[in-house]
Each structure stands twice: as structure tokens, then as C-alpha cells.
Amino acid sequence: MTPSSNSVKTSRFNKVRTDIIGDTDLPNNLIKSLSKSPPHFYNHIIDKKGLRDIIAWAYKSHGIAATAELADDIKDLGFKYATVAAVSISIDDLKIPKEKKFLLEQAEEQITATEERYRLGEITEVERHTKVIDTWTETNERLVLAIKKNFNENDPLNSVWMMANSGARGNISQVRQLVGMRGLMANPQGEIIDLPIRANFKEGLTVTEYVISSYGARKGLVDTALRTADSGYLTRRLVDVAQDVIVREDDCGTERGIVVEADEKGNYGTKLVGRLAAQSVVVDNENRVLVRRNREIDLITACRIEAADIPSVIVRSPLTCEAARSVCRKCYGWALAHNALVDLGEAVGIIAAQSIGEPGTQLTMRTFHTGGVSTAETGLVRSTLEGSIIFGSKARVRPYRTPHGVEAQQAETDFVLQVKPNNGKKSQKVDITNGSLLFVSDSQEVASDTILAQIISGSSVKKSVEKATKDVICDLAGQVRYDEALQPKEVIDRQGSATHKATRLGRVWVLSGDVYNLPPNAKPVIQGNSKVEEGEVLAESRLSSEHGGVVRLRESTGDSREVQIVTTSMTLKDFKLLGESTHSGEIWHLEAKDTTRYLLKTQPGSKIGNGEVIAELADERFRTKTGGLVKYAPGGLSIKKARSAKNGYEVNKGGTLLWIPQETHEINKDISLLMIEDGQWIEDKTEVVKDIFSQIAGIVTVTQKNDILREITVRPGTLYPCNESKVIERFKGEGLLVDEEEIISKNLKAEKRVFVQSVETSEGPQLLIRPVEEYTIPEVAHLPELAIVKQNSGPYLGLKATQRLNFKDGELIKSVEGVELLKTQLILETFDTTPQMTVDVEKVTDKRSKTLERLQLVILETLLVRRDTISDASHGSTHTELQVNDGDLVKSGDVVATTQILCKEVGIVQLPKQIDNEPIRRIIVERDQDTMTIPLGSAPLVSVGQRLVDGDLLAENDPSPCCGQVETIKNNTIIIRIGRPYMISSDSTLHVKDRELVQRGDSLALLVFERQKTGDIVQGLPRIEELLEARRPRDSAVLCKQPGVLTLRHDEETDSSIAVIKSANGEETEYPILLGRNLMVSVGQHIKAGELLTDGPINPHELLEYLFADLRSRKPLMEAAREAIAKVQSRLVTEVQNVYKSQGVTIHNKHIEVIVRQMTSKVRIEDAGETTLLPGELIELRHVEKVNKAMFMTSSSPAVFIPELLGITKASLNTDSFISAASFQETTRVLTEAAIEGKTDYLRGLKENVIIGRLIPAGTGFSGFEEELRSEAGPHPDILDEDPAGYRRMQNLRPDYTVDMPAAASASPAALLDDPSDDELEATRSRHGIEVTTSNTAAFTRPVIVNKIMEDQILDPDIIASLQEEGLLTRE
């Protein structure tokens, strides 16, 4: 954009000399001239960034109004020229670069080569996938460069290009999709699909590409939706933790600060701008002070510091601020909104929370690059000349396999690599850093332009990696062979199951062959290594009967038919089987010769098991007329203990059952419907309640509750008056059985067995003599005659008759109708059935009389016979023959059917080795197409059993045409068994054993590999959350507990390494290094506490604990805590900043510092000493420091504590304000605890005040009461620090009530009323005869602004005394 002089009103900027703020890409001469006047005309392209800098400069120099005008003018200018030039996007503007075709061809070639390497077993499946993805990513990046070059050189004024380039509309990655290629897509699991979309939107997508494209698009939409919710919740938690951080002081007076370091190039960026120096910055060699302590660092000062090459500056920070429960202005520095020192009362906590939470939605899919290390941080170095490589004496390297499966070496030290030319010219020198990869070896001869190394810059952020697994699927059927190099070992896991793991990188081969799966119980009928023809029988399975019996053939269903063998049968030949139809289905009865009827409990055609009831005899002889009481006669009847009374109680021993009848009506109606009285004698057919009649005569008992009639009991019998109290007492309550001839009372003797009860009637106490019915229970139940037909080895089948009583001794049956006391059951006695062996209930026609039907129980052995099948991929064709006919009698072990597995093609059979007599489940036939015969022109160079890949030499000038194993060598002819190698990385789990047979599609192994987490939502938001919630990561890195020197030891038992660190005092600490973990340090190196020993995410709690423990051993408690916290704080700030930076989001450090300050402000008391604190309590560090100072002054023992790192949620719940905590989460728990502890909420934060509905103590609501309180406190200003009332007044909690006094010579202490009501004020005034209008006497008023008594006022002592008595006045 080239502004013309008439389109921008420059008059206003002519006379002002200015500075520019913000790091800028504008040329230096432009910057210099912008800050001078008058402005000159510059012909520069100004893009989005240039515009930003101009606006920032205008705002800094000329204020808001002028800047708004300038912005408006620039906008008009832009629109004017866009209109004149007719800038718009049309399809012709999308120009595809010619290089695209060439780049795609190159990529295809690379991928074909990779696929070939994979086929030859040189790289693993994971390495292939990584290489493919990296190839496409690189192609995409090269295509972007081609697009840029194409537009810049051929069509710089192209509309699409101008819009994307200037930042007006779209960006380069969108243009890439329009004219380059759409690129790689992710599937819903976030994994990258290795098939890229080669077309762009102008060319149009194929159907496949369209589907894959939709996959990625859908994922984008879903992720955006999820991100919004996650980001919102993160913001809410952040606001909650920091809402009470308000700038309350001007200067806390601290001398501490944090160190801000310059980057590798010596730049600070905006890290220093707006901060205050905690220590003066001095240029060492000149003794020149660049900025004094407690002075602001603006852009110019920052540039001077950079120019003086000062590596680090100590600045003040919210992290080190010592203001109580807030931040002071000097530690916070500039408010970023207006680039000046922050005002008092600014709610910096909420600003910080919003600044961190808001970009959460932007932490999105900016990257799709998973494999390898991203190209930005690594540099490939090529040789510039031809010569030999010299590593030098300092070089230490170890073998390394790159993620693409290239064998290389990794440098363990920094050294210089030289390429020494053969012609004696100057050598090429390359600086190799620790961790760089070398693709050449020492003394190797290299040509010009050979890749020598991949240099990894030291500053590269450690990418977070995760363990992932991938299955290796077999592409062909055959036999598995291990390579020697694999060295598998057995690993037993916690559950005790054994798995095999590869200890080294090596190949698993599958040698081709036709594998047959044998059905269970099939046995091979052919010898190993014998030749078979098509259709020949390979194996045979025999189906035999276990017990023998009579054969029944059923109709076939689906692909199998059923053969049933009747092993045992039992017919109930005494009984006729009778069926009758009812509306609820068919009911079957068994009728005996004496016409007693059993009800059949199992329907004919059903299957039953042992112990089930077949039939039940309902015996009318044991049916009562009414309800009543059951008693077992003593010394006779007994029952078996039953777990449940559902089916009654089995009779153990026969005897007499006694039945005392009574009638019980359950009513549940209003008492007003009762038509008789309690204790009344009634006749039968009497109406007891409306519409309810008694069936028998007897005495009535009425049960009622709350005027609701519950039940009415009628007990039959005879009433006898009785006045003997002993007799009445004896038969009280439930009553007693009285035997025949037993004396009941003086003039009463039992003629037969009766039941006696004493009852209260209107005529006084009487004896009720109740009749007893006797039922005789036989000793054993009658069992009908059975006819049993049984095989010798067959299971037993029988019936058992049992008698069951429905009620136990003393049970009361509440009923009007009669009940059954006893039932006889026929129960099946047999073995426990299995799915193959079941008991069936059948009806059969009687052999003598065709009209009669009998019940028969049979035990059936059911065998399923498979139909013939045609061969498929894993099975040969089968042929099944039945060896029996319907009705045949077979013996135990006889063969019922045979199934033969037939061979599909001509070949040689091989049987696998039998292990521990395990049955053979698969056999393999080696066919002609599984081998290749190769004639040789000269003597062979290979031996039998050797495994080869394509291109290996068999003899001079005879390369192998295939992969496989050499089977035979005869007369210069080689036969190779075709195979397929699969590369398996170390530590992978092997799913197959050596020489095992596998089908196509079986899993051979599970590769374990590390992959970088993708830097999208999976990496962004959850990572921020993980850091701010201070989560303990899974599989965290091993940290060093105390400083010392590292040595390594090998543990034979677990086959793992142990790192041993020996400290200065000779103490040794052991750290087991788990399998798959990489050591981050080398042997002999000195390591500090808290440093990483292995790779992996750091557990921040562990880090704080170890740092504190180490510092505690050398420094005082307070100093150690401060220093340990500072280190963890600095790490947290850096980590959070890294996540945002990786997504291109800029957040000022001070915002993150405010949040981190809240997370690290608390300590946990370990030993309270002589303080009033409690062990385990979480307390602010500042508070403990004060308490310990007091203890020191009184020579008491101080509190001992450990610093604690709290996640934002935990910190919010542990805040001083219970109102704020309760409104966040776990309301009930927080309020309950606050109530139990009797907490006070001083309403210091914003949230508490909003909830109570008061003015918030920030912004204009923040009153600067500090000075007034100081003057009021007089000679003891320190009491304000601890005095809650002081705080309350400072924040204007509520208007206090003051007393206006007449003028006086001397000052008096302040008097405050304890919040009286209007009526109380009025009453007090009138009682003391005070008028509101008077000025010479004290008048009680509610103040408007004044909150203290003026110094020239005095109080009448009598008035004070009476006010104090009434409790209306307190003395402060």
C-alpha cells in the first residue's frame, strides 16, 4: 500500500517528536524518521504487521482521537484503491504452480521406495507410516514455497495472493488448499490417514478424496464445539482462583524479583517492557547505569539493555510481591491497556484469568505433524566437497535408528566434524551438537552434496511423547520363523500370564503355504512330509456316543443335523396322562388307579433338571374349612430345615398335625362401618362389617389403628366363667394346648384335646375352650410304580416322593377360606445335566392300549453332525457320513458320524510339532505356487535354510527374484520357499511362536513405539489444564532427589538398569529405570536435585518436594521454601507460555504469574511448634512467616512447614472467603466446614461482594482508606495488618455510625455505634433530649461520607456512659 500525500491528513503529526512501541519489522530509517518531524514519503509495502506498528506508534504519540482518525483514513484509502483496482476473487485467480506435478511425482517415488523397504522387511510398520506421513508433510511445505514463488514472480498483483499475503482475507494454508493440495487429514481418533488428498479445490476432489476430506472437516467442527465448552470452564476456574487479586498498595517494598533472560540472539522481545527493575541494571565494563532500581523499563530502555548485551535482568513480578492478599503497583508494572503504571483498585486477577482463558478457543488444529521431529528445529547438513570424514578425538557416538528406519549414529557430546578433501584444499567443518544425528561414519569417503548430519538445536522444546501400539497383521498364510537377531524372552505380568517380547530389532518371517484349520477333536490321518493329491483326506473327526442307547434321527436344521441317543428312559406305568384345555393353556393330570390325581408341574416336551418337581398331589383330606393356628403334636411330627419356605417344609418324620380353626377378616376400612363389638360372642352368618359376614360362631376380636379397622378375628369354642387368677394367668396371651383328661380349673376337665385361652368379656374374665382338629401325617409318601430302561454306563434316573407341609409349628394362617396343609410331590432324581445331556419329559402311547397315554422321562445325548462344506480360504472342503440309522442300538464309545477334511490342491503336507500332547489345530500344505525354482549359471553362494530378500545374490550375477528361504540346492538349481519378512522393533510383544502356523489376517506382533502428541486440542487445552491443575502425570519422569554423581548398575532379576547417584557425603540413592525409558544424563555427570534422570513429563509436586528437601539441608526454612517455590513457579510460567507460543498465541507473562502466584501461596504445616496453628493445615506463607517471627522474638519454637502446590480448582476451594469457595464447587461441604470452624468472611474479593449484593472493592469502589487508617492507628500502624475491622473499614464494608460533637479543644477516641435501627436512633435522641437540628449538642446521625469523629469534637461523658450501658456504643 503506498499512501499518497493528499489521502492522509498528516498535518497533526508534523510538529510532534515521537517514539514507537512494539517490536516492528519497519526499516530502521523509517523508525528513526517517524520519531522526527516533519514526516517523509516512503514507498514501502505495508502489510498487517506494518499497519499494526503504525497504529501503535500513533496511539503512543498522539492519543486515541488522532489514532482513530488515522485508522479511518487508512481504511478509506484501502477501500478506494481496492475499488479502483477491482480486487475480488475469481476462479481464474487460482493459478496452480507448474512444479506441483514434479513434486507429487517425487513424493510418489519416495513412498514407493519406502513401501519396497517395508516389503523387504527393512523397516517396521510404524517406520513406514511415519515416513509416508513425513514425506507428504514435506511435499506440502515445498508446494507452499512453490506457490509463493509462482505468485511473486509471475503474478504479484493477483487478488487471492494480495489478500492472503497482506492478512486482509485468508492465510497461506487456505491458499495452499485452493491451488496446491489439500494434504493430509486426520480421522476421528486424531490419527493421520496416510492417504493424502493430492488434488486441490480448483482441480476438484475424487469421491475417495471427498470422503476423507469430510472426515477431517467433521473432526474440525466437533473439536471446535468441544473446545468452546472446555475453554469456558477453564476461564471460570481461573476467574475463581484470581478474582480477589486487586492492586491494593503502591509499593510492597520487596527487594526480591525474578530473572528475565534474553534468548539465544540476545533479544528480550517485550519481556522487559512495562516491568520495574528489582535491581539496577549496570553495564559492567563501563559502570554505566542503564536503569535504576524500582524504575520502569520502557521500550527505549529495553532496546538499550539489548544493545549492551546484558544476558539477564532482575525485574519485579507478582510472583515475588509481598503485598498481603493482593499485588502492589510496582510489582505488577504497566497495565497493558494504556502502557502506564497500573492504578490502585485494578482487578488484575480477573484480567489475568480472562487473558489466559480466552485464547483457549484458539488452541486449535494448527498442526497435523506427528512423525519425526518438526522441520523448524532441525537442520540437514550436506557436504560441500568430496573427501573423507574425520570425527576427531572428542567425538562420542552411539548407534541410533531414526523414526524412518534409517540406521544412523547419535552424538553424545559436542564436537566438530571435518570433511577432509582428497585434493588437499581447505576442509569443511560442521559443529555437531549433543543429540544430533550423523548419517556418515568416521573415515568414510563421501561425495559432494551427501547428507552428513541432522543438527538438533539445543533450545528445542522437549516434545511431549506418548506410548502407542500398532498391530502387525500377516498378509499371507504360512509358517512363522523367527530371525536369530530377535532374541525373544518370556515376560510374566502381574496376573501371572506369560507374553513373549522381542529384546532386539529383528525380523519375523512367514513362509507361504496353504493352512487348514482343523475342527475340534479332528486328527490328521496323513504322515508329515508326504505328498497329497486334490480331494485326498487330510484329517478326520469322529463323533461318538458317550453312554450308548437307542438312536433317534431328527430333521436337519441349517448347516447341521441333530442325532439324539436315548440313554435312559423311565415310564410311569401306574398313571394315565390326561390333558384338559383351559383359558390359560393346557393342564395335564396324572390319574392313579384309585383315582387320586396328581397335577403335572412340567409340560410334555419340556426339559427338566435334578431336584425339579414333576407332579404334585393335592390331597383333599388335608384341606381345612377356614384359617387357623397350626401346632405339631409333641414327640411326633418333625420337618427338615429349609433355606426358604417358598415350597413348604419337607416332612422328616410322620405324626399328628393339630389344627385350631379361626376366621380372620382383613378389612382396612373406616371404624364407623363396624357392626359388632370387641369381645362379643356372635353366631354364624352374622354381619360383622357392612357386607361382610362371619362363616362360624365364636368370640370376636377387633384390631384397629387410628380409627381404621384393620382386621376382625372370630374364634369358635365354648366360654366358661372363671375367677381363679392363677388359671386366668396360665392361659393368658396366645393360649395353651390341653391334653385329654387334663384338669383346666377346679370344676373343669378336658374330655378330649382342646386349646384354652383366657379372654376378657363384658361379664368379666372367661376361659375360651377351642376345638382342635387332628390330621395324621403318614411316615412316608406313596410312590407309584415305575418302569426304567437304563444303559450300563448311562446316568441314573429315578423319582422320589416327598411330603411337604405348607406351614411351620405355631404359624397363624389369617384367612376366611380353607387352606391346604400337606402336599405330596414327585421329584426327579438324576445327575446334574449338561448341554449335551438333558432330561426330557415326553408323552407316549401305551403299548397294550393305543388310547391310553403315559408319561415318560428320557435322558438324551444330543450330537450335532455338520453338513458337507465347500472349501474356503481357511478350511478345506469337508465330507460328513452318518454311521447309524434311526432306532439302532449303539454301545458306549461307538462312532455315530465321521467328518473328513479334504485337500484343495496338490502339495506336500507338513505337521506342526506337538507340544505337551496338545491336539494339532492347523496343518499346512506346501503347494507348487509356494516355491520358486531358479536355475543358476554358476556355483551357489547360499546354503540350505538361509533366508533371503529380493536382490540378494544366489550366485555370481544371479540375484534372488523373491523373498523366502532356501529349501534345496541340487545341480546348480535352487528351490526357494516364498516368504514375507516383517521387521519387529525391540520391546514389541510377539503374538506367535516360532514355527507356528498362521492364517492371513492374524496378528503377528504388537509394536510399541513413542509418538509425539499432535499439537492440536489434544495437546493445547488439556495440556494447559494439566499444568494449571498441577496434575500428577502418568508415567512421569524420574527426578533426582539429592545432588550427586551418576553411575549405572544392571539388575539381573528384573533385567533392567538402575541409576545410582552418590552424593558428596557418600550416600547412595537408587533409581530403577523402567524398560523403554531413555536416560537423559550420562554416566559420571554431576546432577542437581530436581533434574531429569529419564525422559517423560515432570510431576510438579515431586519437583517441589525434592527441591525443597535439598535446599532445606543447606538453608533456613523460610529461604528454602521461597527458593523452591520460585523455581517451580518459573517452570510453570515457562511451560504454560510454551503451549500458547506453539499455537502462535501471545500472552504477557505477568498474567500467568498472577495465576501461578495463587497456586503457590500456601504451605502445609508439618509441626506446629508452640504456635496456635494445626498440623496439616494449609496456611498462607506470609502468615506463617509473621507467626514464626513472633515466635523468634519470644524464643518459642516456630512452626515447621512444607510448600504446597495447589491446582486452580483446589486453590479456589481453599481460599479465605467461604462465600467465594461455596459459590464455586462442593457448596454443601464448604459451607458445613465453614460453619463448624466458625469462619468469618471479610468480603475482600469481588465475588463475595457480588453475591452479598454490595459494591465491589475494585475500580471506583476501591477506597483509599489506607492513609486515614494509618493516621487513626497513631503510633501502632502495624495493628492494621492483623486487624479485620481495619480491613473492613478500608473497604467500606458498611456505613459505620458516627456521632457529631460540639467543637472542643482536645481530641477524643472514635466512637462507633453498633448498627442501630432508625427507631433505636430516634429513641436514643429523644431520651437524651437531642434535636436533630441542634449543633451545640451531640446529634446521632447516619454519616454520608465522613467515617470518623472530627478531632475538634468532644463527647459528654454521661451520654457515653448511658450509651455504653444500652449497648449502642462500642469503644475502639
Curated annotation (Swiss-Prot):
Family (UniProt): Belongs to the RNA polymerase beta' chain family. RpoC2 subfamily.
Annotated keywords: DNA-directed RNA polymerase, Metal-binding, Nucleotidyltransferase, Organellar chromatophore, Plastid, Transcription, Transferase, Zinc
Subcellular location per the Swiss-Prot or TrEMBL entry: Plastid, Organellar chromatophore
Cited function: DNA-dependent RNA polymerase catalyzes the transcription of DNA into RNA using the four ribonucleoside triphosphates as substrates.
EC number: 2.7.7.6
Record-listed Zn(2+) binding positions: 252, 321, 328, 331
Name of protein: DNA-directed RNA polymerase subunit beta''
Recorded GO CC terms: DNA-directed RNA polymerase complex; mitochondrion; organellar chromatophore; plastid
Gene3D superfamilies xref list: 1.10.132.30, 1.10.150.390, 1.10.1790.20, 2.40.50.100, RNA polymerase Rpb1, domain 3 (1.10.274.100)
GO MF term set: DNA binding; DNA-directed RNA polymerase activity; metal ion binding
InterPro entries for the chain: DNA-dir_RpoC2_beta_pp (IPR012756), DNA-dir_RpoC_beta_prime (IPR045867), RNA_pol_Rpb1_3 (IPR007066), RNA_pol_Rpb1_3_sf (IPR042102), RNA_pol_Rpb1_4 (IPR007083), RNA_pol_Rpb1_5 (IPR007081), Rpb1_funnel_sf (IPR038120)
Required co-factors: Zn(2+)
GO biological process terms held by the UniProt record: DNA-templated transcription
Subunit structure, interactors included: In plastids the minimal PEP RNA polymerase catalytic core is composed of four subunits: alpha, beta, beta', and beta''. When a (nuclear-encoded) sigma factor is associated with the core the holoenzyme is formed, which can initiate transcription.
Reactions this protein catalyses: RNA(n) + a ribonucleoside 5'-triphosphate = RNA(n+1) + diphosphate
Listed Pfam families: RNA_pol_Rpb1_3, RNA_pol_Rpb1_4, RNA_pol_Rpb1_5
Top-level EC class as recorded in UniProt: transferase
Cofactor details (free text): Binds 1 Zn(2+) ion per subunit.
